[in-house]
């Protein structure tokens, strides 16, 4: 029988939490992200999420469909928007050939068009292209890169594309495994600013202590299968943990 990596741990994730997962190598930080994302099953315990909660996970292994440009790949973040675009195009094509303006079917078609336009606007359909370009540029891409195939970029740059997709999806929970690994200083600063104003919850693993300090407002330490939860960013957590250990020794 194997040894449990975690035992009896419990914590609650609230909107606005920006949690830094820390611990020694092999403590289970990336594994806990995979448990939260349901990429791996646990041998026991339960996780409870709101029914409609949307979760995005930046994994270390990224697999893109070949033949897409950077923009086309980034637009994969907007599956429903792209579907509605096709439906609107089809309805408008039908309307150009119709002359039965008084018929019930024509009225239904107009209503369908109105409903889809409202849904499209609600999803941000009129803004997503500009948002995509802004985030790609924030992560270091130039406009002239947008129409280049993703196949021509290194793994580090492909990770930036995947990160852009996650940021564009506006998930309720964002799970990030070493998001700064392949970023330059300018892109890291941009990402810090973006994540600080993120409306959902964030759980991240990073060896970049300054990034943790600048982004997180809560630290969870994993040690020997247990977790220790502090409502502090990384540096303040270190001070608090030191004070606690000093008191325990007294």
Label the predicted regions.
Residues 1-249:
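ABC ATP-binding cassette signature C-motif
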């Amino acid at each position: 029988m194997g040894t449990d990596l975690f035992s009896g741990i419990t914590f609650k994730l609230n909107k606005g939490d920006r949690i830094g997962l820390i611990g020694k190598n092999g403590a289970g930080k990336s594994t806990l992200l995979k448990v939260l994302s349901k990429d791996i099953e646990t041998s026991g315990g339960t996780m409870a999420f709101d029914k409609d909660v949307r979760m995005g996970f930046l994994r270390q292994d990224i697999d893109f469909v070949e033949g897409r440009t950077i923009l086309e790949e980034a637009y994969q973040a907007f599956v429903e928007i792209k579907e509605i675009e096709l439906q609107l195009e089809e309805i408008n094509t039908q309307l150009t050939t119709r002359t039965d303006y008084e018929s019930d079917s024509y009225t239904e078609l107009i209503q369908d068009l109105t409903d889809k336009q409202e849904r499209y606007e609600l999803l941000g359909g009129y803004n997503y292209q500009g948002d995509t370009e802004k985030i790609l540029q924030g992560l270091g891409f130039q406009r002239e890169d947008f129409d280049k195939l993703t196949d021509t970029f290194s793994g580090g740059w492909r990770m930036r594309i995947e990160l852009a997709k996650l940021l564009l999806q506006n998930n309720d929970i964002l799970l990030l495994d070493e998001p700064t690994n392949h970023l330059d200083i300018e892109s890291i600063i941009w990402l810090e600013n973006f994540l600080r104003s993120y409306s959902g919850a964030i759980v991240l693993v990073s060896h970049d202590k300054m990034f943790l300090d600048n982004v997180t407002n809560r630290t969870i330490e994993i040690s020997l299968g247990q977790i220790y939860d502090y409502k502090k960013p990384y540096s303040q957590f270190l001070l608090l943990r030191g004070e606690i250990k000093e008191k325990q020794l007294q």
